[in-house]
C-alpha cells in the first residue's frame, strides 16, 4: 500500500507570484515570491482552484470548518490574511521573552505555538490539502508579515565565523545553513507526517477509526518473556542511552514542581487540564493496573517548533539538543550551563570529592539547585547529580556513563596542563573538550555501531571509519538534524534490551549482587558508597543483555518512575507508542517501504520478517498491517545477520548516523578545517577504546575485555590487564605546543 492511499490523492496546484526561481516538488509548481510587504491585498500564496473544491479523504475532514466561498479559478492567501491570523493568535498566545537565554524552551515553544496557530487558522479557513500544508505554506515569506516581530534571531539571522571550537548550541555547524543540527530546531523527517486531521491530530488507522490503545499494544505485543542475548552486554545499553541523550530530548510542558514529569492530566477536570494533555488510557481488564484501580497514565504532547525563518506548515516538534555527537551530555547545550559545570581553573569540570579521604576518584557535582528535578529524594539531605544533560539521574547506569566521561575530560585537561604549562584555563578546557568529543565520536562509530548494525549495514551507509589519514566526507548539503523516526522510535531500540535487574561484579569478575532496575531509576545513591562505581562498571561488562525482540521487562512496562513505596509505575512501551502517534509518524510499513523492504497488505505476508506468534498478536488488535506502530514493528523484527537490529531500525539508525557524520563540519576525521586535528593527533584518537576509558577512569579495575560491549571470550575477546600495553593509550605529547623545545620535559612527564 502506497503513502498516497493514506494521504489525499487529489492535489491542487500551488503557485507563488514572481518568477525569480521556480521548481517542481511532488508535482506542485512552486515559484518564489518577490512582492513588497506593504502592498494592500497582495498575495502571499495562490492556490490553483477556487478553494474547498477537492474531495478530501478522512485525514483532512476536520479542516473543513469555514463557510467562506471563493469564486474564480484561483484562491489567494494574502499577507493581510496572514497578519489577521497573527493578530488573532496574539490575543490568545503569550510569547515569552527571550531574556538572556534565547534557547529557553518556554520562549521557543511560545513562538512555535503562535506560528502553528496561524498555520492552523489558514488551513481551516482555506480548506488546505495535505500537500498545500506541507509544501505550500512553508514557502510563504513570513519576514514580510508581522510574524517577523517575534521570530527568534537564531532562526532567521545568524552570522557564522569559522573557528576551532564548536558552539554548545550547535549553531554554525554548517556555515551555509547555520541552524542545521542546532538545538531547539525542528526534528527532520524521512517521510511526511500522517496526522489524523492533516496538520496536528495524532495518527489514526488507515480505515479512519482509532488505533488500539497504546497500553493494549504494550501488554499484547510486548510482554516480559525474559529472553537473553548470547553475546551483548549491558554496556551496549549504557553507551546507547548515553548517545541517545546526546541526540534527542523533545520539548514538552513540564510539571511546575519537579520539572521532569509531564504535567498532571489524569486527575484534573477538563477545564483545568493543560491543552497538551494526551493521556494514555488503561482498559478496565488490564491484568496489572486493575489491581491498583489505575485507568490513566499522564502524558503530554510535544510543543510545536518554529521552523527556520518562522515558516508556516503542519506541526513539527523541536529537539532541545543538537543533531551532532558533540558531548552535550558532558558539557550542555548552552554556554551558560557549561559555565555552571566548570571550575575555571586548569580547564577542569567541577566534581564532588566524595571519596577524597579514600584516595578514590571524584563523582559528579551535586545537584543543589532545584534538587528534586529528575530526582527521587528520600530526604532533604540526599542529592542527585548535575551534568551536561538533565536526565543524568534517570537511572544509575546512565549516571555512571556521565561520570566516566566527565572524569575523562579532567584527565585530559590535567595531562594537557602538564605538557603545555603556558596554556590558560580556557585553552585547556576547550582542547580537552575537543579531544573528549572526538573520543565519544570514535568509540561510537568504532565499537558501538558495528555491534548494533553489523558490517554490511556499516559499509552500505558509509559508516566505516578510516584507519589511516583524513576522511574528507563533509557535505554542506547534508542536514545533521535529528530524524523524528530516530528520536521517537528507532533509537528507543534499547528498551528491548533492558534487564530486569542491574548487577554488580567484583574486580575479579565475580557476581556480587543485583538490584531491580526500577529501584535505580532517579535514585543514583548507591554511587555514594566507596568502590560501588567500579562494581557497577564490572557488572556492565559481565552482565548479558536481554535479547532484541518484542519482549520488554516489566520493570519499565509496569514500574517506570515508580514513586517511593508505590507498587506500580508508568509504562515506557505505551509512551513510545503514544509519542510516535502524536509526532505523526507514519506506520511501520511505510518505513519498510522507505528502506526498500517489502510492504505487506496482509498479516500473513509478514511471516518472514518477525515471529509467527507476534504476527498473530498483531492481527488480533490491528485492522491492517499499515496501522502497526513503527517502534513496535521495529523491535519485533528478526535481526539482520551480524546485527542486533532488524532491517527497518538498522536503516533508520544508519541514516541518522550517516547524516551526523557527513553533516558535521567539526567531525574529528576531517581535514582542512580550523577544528581539524593534525595527522599525528588523529592517529592517537584512533587508538582509544572504551576499555581504555574504563581502565583510566575507575579506581580498582585492572582487567577488562578488549570490547566491553561484548561478553568476554578467551580467543576473540579476551580479558587483558589495563597496564599490559595491549589496550593502547592516547599520547598527549602530540598536543604539545612546542614539542621540540619541551621534549626533555615530556619524556619526564610521560615516563619515557
Q: Where would I find each of the regions flagged by the language model?
A:
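Alpha-helical bundle segments that constitute or directly flank the non-heme di-iron/ferroxidase center
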Residues: 395-407
Amino acid at each position: 500500500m502506497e503513502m498516497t492511499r493514506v494521504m489525499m490523492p487529489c492535489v491542487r496546484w500551488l503557485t507563488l507570484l514572481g518568477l525569480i526561481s521556480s521548481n517542481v516538488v511532488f508535482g506542485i509548481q512552486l515559484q518564489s515570491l518577490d512582492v513588497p510587504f506593504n502592498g494592500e491585498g497582495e498575495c502571499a500564496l495562490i492556490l490553483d482552484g477556487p478553494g474547498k473544491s477537492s474531495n478530501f479523504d478522512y485525514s483532512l475532514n476536520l479542516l473543513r470548518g469555514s463557510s467562506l466561498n471563493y469564486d474564480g479559478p484561483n484562491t489567494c492567501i494574502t499577507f493581510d490574511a496572514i497578519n489577521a491570523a497573527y493578530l488573532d493568535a496574539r490575543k490568545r498566545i503569550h510569547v515569552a521573552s527571550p531574556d538572556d537565554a534565547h534557547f529557553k524552551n518556554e520562549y521557543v515553544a511560545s513562538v512555535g505555538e503562535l506560528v502553528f496557530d496561524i498555520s492552523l487558522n489558514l488551513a481551516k479557513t482555506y480548506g488546505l490539502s495535505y500537500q498545500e500544508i506541507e509544501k505550500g505554506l512553508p514557502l510563504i515569506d513570513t519576514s514580510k508579515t508581522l510574524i517577523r516581530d517575534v521570530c527568534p534571531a537564531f532562526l532567521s539571522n545568524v552570522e557564522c565565523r569559522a573557528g576551532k571550537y564548536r558552539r554548545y548550541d550547535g549553531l554554525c555547524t554548517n556555515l551555509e545553513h547555520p541552524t542545521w543540527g542546532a538545538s531547539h530546531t525542528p526534528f527532520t523527517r524521512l517521510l511526511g507526517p500522517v496526522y489524523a486531521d492533516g496538520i496536528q491530530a495524532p495518527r489514526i488507522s488507515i480505515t479512519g477509526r482509532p488505533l488500539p490503545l497504546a497500553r493494549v499494544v504494550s501488554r499484547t505485543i510486548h510482554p516480559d518473556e525474559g529472553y537473553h542475548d548470547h553475546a551483548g552486554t549491558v554496556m551496549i545499553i549504557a553507551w546507547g542511552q548515553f548517545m541517545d541523550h546526546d541526540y534527542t530530548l523533545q520539548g514538552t510542558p513540564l510539571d511546575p514542581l519537579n520539572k521532569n514529569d509531564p504535567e498532571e492530566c489524569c486527575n484534573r477536570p477538563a477545564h483545568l487540564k493543560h491543552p497538551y494533555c494526551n493521556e494514555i488510557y488503561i482498559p478496565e481488564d488490564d491484568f496489572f493496573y486493575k489491581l491498583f484501580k489505575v485507568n490513566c497514565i499522564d502524558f503530554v504532547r510535544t510543543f510545536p517548533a518554529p521552523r527556520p525563518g518562522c515558516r508556516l506548515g503542519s506541526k513539527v516538534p523541536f529537539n532541545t539538543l543538537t543533531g551532532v555527537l558533540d558531548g552535550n551530555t558532558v558539557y550542555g547545550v548552552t554556554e551558560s550551563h557549561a559555565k555552571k559545570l566548570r571550575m575555571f581553573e586548569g580547564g577542569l569540570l567541577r566534581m564532588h570529592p566524595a571519596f577524597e579521604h579514600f584516595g578514590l576518584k571524584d563523582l559528579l557535582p551535586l545537584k543543589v539547585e532545584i534538587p528534586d528535578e529528575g530526582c527521587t529524594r528520600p530526604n532533604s539531605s540526599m542529592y542527585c547529580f548535575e551534568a551536561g544533560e538533565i536526565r543524568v539521574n534517570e537511572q544509575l547506569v546512565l549516571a555512571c556513563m556521565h561520570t566516566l566521561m566527565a572524569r575523562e575530560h579532567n584527565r585530559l585537561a590535567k595531562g594537557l596542563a602538564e605538557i603545555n604549562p603556558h596554556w590558560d584555563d580556557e585553552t585547556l578546557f576547550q582542547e580537552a573538550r575537543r579531544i573528549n568529543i572526538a573520543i565519544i565520536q570514535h568509540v561510537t562509530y568504532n565499537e558501538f555501531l558495528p555491534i548494533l548494525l553489523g558490517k554490511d549495514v556499516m559499509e552500505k551507509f558509509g559508516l566505516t571509519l578510516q584507519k589511516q589519514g583524513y576522511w574528507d566526507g563533509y557535505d554542506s548539503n547534508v542536514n545533521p538534524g535529528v530524524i523524528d523516526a530516530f528520536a521517537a522510535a528507532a533509537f528507543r531500540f534499547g528498551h528491548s534490551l533492558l534487564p530486569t535487574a542491574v548487577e554488580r561484579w567484583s574486580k575479579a569478575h565475580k557476581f556480587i549482587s543485583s538490584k531491580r532496575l526500577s529501584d535505580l531509576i532517579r535514585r543514583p545513591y548507591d554511587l555514594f558508597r566507596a568502590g560501588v562505581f567500579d562494581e557497577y562498571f564490572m557488572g556492565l561488562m559481565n552482565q548479558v543483555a536481554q535479547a532484541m525482540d518484542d519482549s520488554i521487562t516489566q520493570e519499565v512496562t509496569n514500574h517506570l518512575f515508580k514513586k517511593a513505596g508505590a507498587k506500580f509505575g508508568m509504562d515506557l512501551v505505551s509512551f513510545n507508542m503514544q509519542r510516535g502517534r502524536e509526532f505523526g509518524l507514519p506506520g511501520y510499513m511505510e518505513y519498510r517501504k522507505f528502506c526498500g523492504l517489502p510492504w505487506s497488505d496482509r498479516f500473513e505476508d509478514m511471516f518472514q520478517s518477525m515471529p509467527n506468534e507476534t504476527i498473530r498478536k498483531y492481527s488480533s488488535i490491528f485492522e491492517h498491517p499499515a496501522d502497526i506502530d513503527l517502534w513496535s514493528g521495529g523491535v519485533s523484527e528478526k535481526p539482520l545477520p551480524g546485527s542486533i537490529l532488524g532491517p527497518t531500525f538498522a536503516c533508520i539508525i544508519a541514516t541518522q548516523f550517516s547524516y551526523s557524520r557527513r553533516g558535521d563540519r567539526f567531525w574529528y576525521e576531517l581535514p582542512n578545517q580550523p577544528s581539524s586535528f593534525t595527522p599525528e593527533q588523529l592517529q592517537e584518537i584512533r587508538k582509544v577504546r572504551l576499555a581504555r576509558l574504563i581502565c583510566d577512569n575507575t579506581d580498582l579495575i585492572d582487567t577488562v575485555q578488549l570490547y566491553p560491549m561484548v561478553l568476554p571470550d578467551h580467543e576473540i575477546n579476551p580479558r587483558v590487564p589495563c597496564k599490559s600495553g595491549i589496550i593502547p593509550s592516547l599520547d598527549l605529547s602530540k598536543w604539545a605546543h612546542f614539542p621540540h623545545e619541551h621534549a626533555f620535559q615530556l619524556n619526564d612527564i610521560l615516563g619515557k
